[in-house]
């Protein structure tokens, strides 16, 4: 056993003592010894103080060896052991202090979690780098796509412009063909081009263009208007027909040559035949047909048969609706019988002439039954001309039958006087 005295503390090393071999116990003893040593050192500074009590701590050699990590030599001096032990003690103390500080700050990270964190950080950095690269690639692709899209849009605009130009050219061609077919009276073909007009084209603008074309050339305007009336009848839409009728009416009213002639009558009768339009707007018919019919009757009564004859020649169906009215002389014009009676043979068709003669003989019977002779003489002259006209052409049996009926009508006015009598009188008077 060895004994070392350090300022009143004796450390006794003995191989026989093995009971104190645990590190915590020894560390506690050493800490107490260090405190006591410090207190003893302060006491020795006073020269007059009594000698402090000495404290002996017995530490076995085995304990010292275990505390020293098993590296203590058997023959090591006590001083060396003590110095080494103190050094180890201070190191342990520092380590414990550091551990205490770390414990106070927070739990120490698990080495495995540190490793995982490093892997996570590396993966995050790699993902961020890949994201930046991917974003840069996408940016380039987006820029390229934008440029390509812009080029395609420019190409699309150019193509659309060309398409619009072609569409405009096509529509202009359709309009030209439509107007050309109206001009020559090909109403069915004109209607096919009319139906090809695009829905985007305002229909009122198209109608205005059609009516302007009709009146573009003065010498053709009458015939073109008649063709237009036939064309309008074939349009399916009632509203579109009414629109064209109204535009045409305005132009007819502006022109005395049409307003005072047979053209106005054709227009009015065309509207009258179009029952849906007529029922929707009777004024289109009534305002013009009365004026037109009155003017034609005045002209015929005064011996001006041109407009009535043109109506009979160009529009026989429409003329048929007015022929009885035109052949009827108003009482105020009866004194102009000599001017009126040639009207019968001014008409182009046999049936039209016979109708005038029928109405004429009927009026003579109603108005001049006692003084009918001079009127019948003049009527017989016109009947003879009509009979010769019919004889030069081919007529059906209905016309021949009507001719014979009118011939017999002359014999009903005076007893013993027939058609031949009045015809002979007419030849005598004409010399």
Curated annotation (Swiss-Prot):
Disruption phenotype: No significant effects on mosquito fitness. No significant effects on blood feeding behavior of female mosquitoes. (Microbial infection) Decrease in microgametocytemia and numbers of traversed ookinetes when female mosquitoes are fed on Plasmodium berghei-infected mice. Fewer Plasmodium berghei oocysts in the mosquito midgut on days 7 and 8 post infection. Decrease in parasite transmission from mosquitoes with low Plasmodium berghei loads. Reduced prevalence of infection and fewer Plasmodium falciparum oocysts in the mosquito midgut after infection. No significant effects on recognition of the salivary glands by Plasmodium berghei sporozoites. One of its GO terms (cellular component) is extracellular region. Glycans are attached at residue 95. Residues 1-39 form the signal peptide. Female salivary gland (at protein level). Not detected in female carcass without salivary glands, midgut and hemolymph (at protein level). Probably not expressed in male tissues. It is found in: Secreted. The keyword Secreted applies. Its main location: secreted. Keywords: Coiled coil, Glycoprotein, Secreted, Signal. The keyword Oxidoreductase does not apply. Residues 120-169 form a coiled coil. Homodimer. (Microbial infection) Facilitates efficient midgut colonization by Plasmodium berghei parasites. Promotes successful transmission of Plasmodium berghei at low infection densities. This is Saglin. It comes from Anopheles coluzzii (African malaria mosquito).
């Amino acid at each position: 056993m060895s004994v070392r005295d350090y300022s009143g503390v004796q450390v006794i090393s003995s191989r026989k003592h093995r009971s104190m071999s645990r590190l915590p116990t020894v560390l506690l003893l050493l800490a107490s010894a260090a405190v006591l040593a410090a207190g003893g050192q302060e006491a020795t500074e006073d020269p007059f103080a009594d000698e402090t009590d000495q404290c002996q701590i017995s530490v076995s050699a085995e304990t010292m060896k275990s505390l020293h990590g098993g590296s203590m030599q058997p023959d090591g001096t006590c001083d060396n052991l003590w110095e080494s032990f103190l050094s180890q003690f201070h190191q342990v103390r520092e380590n414990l202090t550091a551990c205490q500080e770390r414990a106070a700050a927070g739990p120490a990270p698990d080495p495995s979690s540190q490793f995982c964190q490093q892997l996570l950080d590396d993966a995050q950095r790699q993902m961020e780098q890949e994201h930046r690269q991917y974003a840069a690639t996408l940016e380039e692709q987006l820029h390229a796509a934008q440029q390509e899209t812009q080029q395609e849009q420019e190409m699309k605009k150019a193509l659309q412009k060309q398409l619009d130009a072609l569409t405009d050219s096509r529509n202009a061609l359709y309009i030209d063909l439509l107007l050309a077919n109206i001009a020559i009276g090909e109403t069915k073909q004109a209607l096919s081009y009319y139906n090809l007009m695009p829905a985007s084209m305002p229909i009122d603008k198209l109608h205005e263009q059609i009516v302007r074309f009709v009146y573009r050339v003065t010498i053709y305007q009458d015939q073109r208007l008649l063709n237009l009336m036939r064309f309008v009848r074939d349009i399916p839409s009632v509203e579109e027909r009414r629109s064209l009728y109204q535009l045409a009416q305005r132009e007819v009213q502006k022109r005395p040559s049409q307003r005072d002639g047979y053209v106005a009558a054709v227009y009015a009768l065309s509207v009258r035949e179009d029952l849906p339009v007529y029922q929707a707007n009777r004024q289109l018919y009534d305002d013009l047909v009365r004026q037109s019919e009155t003017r034609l009757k005045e002209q015929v009564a005064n011996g001006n048969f041109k407009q009535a004859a043109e109506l009979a020649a160009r529009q026989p169906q429409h003329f048929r609706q007015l022929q009885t009215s035109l052949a009827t002389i108003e009482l105020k014009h009866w004194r102009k019988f000599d001017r009126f009676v040639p009207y019968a043979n001014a008409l182009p068709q046999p049936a039209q002439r016979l109708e005038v003669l029928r109405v004429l003989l009927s009026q003579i019977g109603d108005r001049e039954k006692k003084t009918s002779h001079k009127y019948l003489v003049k009527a017989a002259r016109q009947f003879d001309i009509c009979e010769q006209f019919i004889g030069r052409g081919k007529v059906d049996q209905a016309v021949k039958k009507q001719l014979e009926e009118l011939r017999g009508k002359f014999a009903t006015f005076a007893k013993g006087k027939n058609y031949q009598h009045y015809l002979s009188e007419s030849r005598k008077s004409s010399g």
